[in-house]
């Protein structure tokens, strides 16, 4: 058995070299690489701007480990997220499908899952690449952020849990980091809820005082019962406004190992070492492969949890410190691959779920990312800054080092790419929007298979791009854009995030047209007077939109009001509710 095991390891170590020889001998080498079953390591940052990384043009942020991946592999410069916010983008990444197909969108403004104790989530009838790879014999793990739902009918059914979507192992947050986890002034939920509760308290207190005065002066013929009830309700609301912050911290900011809560609420100073320890443990346990590991970083989402030895070290404040710490984490993971002899047999992919947030700002201090030359940011369905993200692939000896590809690609492309590498079949019973990237990465194809890409904001189509290959032109058409606040600011600074519909968006007739191949910053609007083929482009894009919309089927919207309200009976709790507190694992080594 020892001899056979050693032979297996030797074969896996020679695999990349053998594949490289095949690539040099035959133009159809990509078909030889299919089903080669490498280990697959997927790294996804949270809220990272494409301009935050050295290899994408930042010369003041230190990201040597991510830059090394690009130097040793293939860098995609037109890599597009299917959505500009966390939940829908991650759903599209895992399924290879626009989030509107799975219902991971909203029509009322709830654009991501709002609570761990909500019933919405990635539907069980969706097929993730993890599910297919597990069926093909891969060990599958997810470490870090999930944010695709947890429970449906009870606090323990875990119907949306990663382990029900193809992952053998899960360690991390079933929800997402938020400013509220650290009771930051930059608040996603707490401040808004406190304001509403305080308003209701004032109303009920006024009612109670009015009834008391009317009762004592005999002007209002009322019994004492409604007076007492209104007064008690006012006191309860006042108490709730004080405790809502603690409720959010305990309800959403916790860690799980598989189906068990290990830390509620999270101890931030332990989080990064625990994540790294878990990654190293998974790699060591499964080094005889094959494995799929999805490391979904909590970085660089607010509240920007950063260890003390990285604080104050960057040139860009706390946000820069957090980016540089994440890069250090990438380096530690790469070191583990080297130590375990896995580097040459592992395909690595690095990306972000969407663009950096421009509205994360307190005074003159920016707590969000930089999107480089691209307009807009997180939450903006059509502008490039919200959806153009890093895309780096490394597979030593197989993928050419230092290659740069400017063709349009999508996060959804990872689905068919890894399924093909694992020897699996892409589902034929549903529309898969992603395209296999292997021919493009290997250089056996010069053009992306994406002629069109659609850009949604919630369930509303805001923009579309057309790659007109015969002209070498990348057209971008905007049907709807948000109204920036203040005007011309490039972001919605009066809000947490730009809206998708309503009075604060503009519906363009005719739509806005840009040529991204000459104007990637989307600064020069083309008109019939300035662009001779204006109407032909509009007609072709509109036809593509109609063809795309004909492939859509009605599905329940997981992020609408019913699926996105907090339900106490769905709330995970490792102690007597609402005193949810536990610490079940030792400090990291």
Swiss-Prot record:
Taxonomic placement: Eukaryota, Metazoa, Chordata, Craniata, Vertebrata
Post-translational modification: N-glycosylated. The conversion to 3-oxoalanine (also known as C-formylglycine, FGly), of a serine or cysteine residue in prokaryotes and of a cysteine residue in eukaryotes, is critical for catalytic activity.
Organism: Homo sapiens
Medical condition linked: Chondrodysplasia punctata 1, X-linked recessive: A clinically and genetically heterogeneous disorder characterized by punctiform calcification of the bones. CDPX1 is a congenital defect of bone and cartilage development characterized by aberrant bone mineralization, severe underdevelopment of nasal cartilage, and distal phalangeal hypoplasia. This disease can also be induced by inhibition with the drug warfarin.
Name of one Pfam family that matches: Sulfatase_C
Any one biological process term the GO annotation gives: skeletal system development
Known role: Exhibits arylsulfatase activity towards the artificial substrate 4-methylumbelliferyl sulfate. May be essential for the correct composition of cartilage and bone matrix during development. Has no activity toward steroid sulfates.
Active site, renumbered: 86, 147
UniProt-annotated glycosylation sites, renumbered to this chain: 58, 125, 258, 344
This protein's name: Arylsulfatase L
Record keywords: Calcium, Disease variant, Glycoprotein, Golgi apparatus, Hydrolase, Metal-binding, Signal
Catalytic activity: an aryl sulfate + H2O = a phenol + sulfate + H(+)
Subcellular location: Golgi apparatus, Golgi stack
Activity regulation, per record: Inhibited by millimolar concentrations of warfarin.
Reported cofactor(s): Ca(2+)
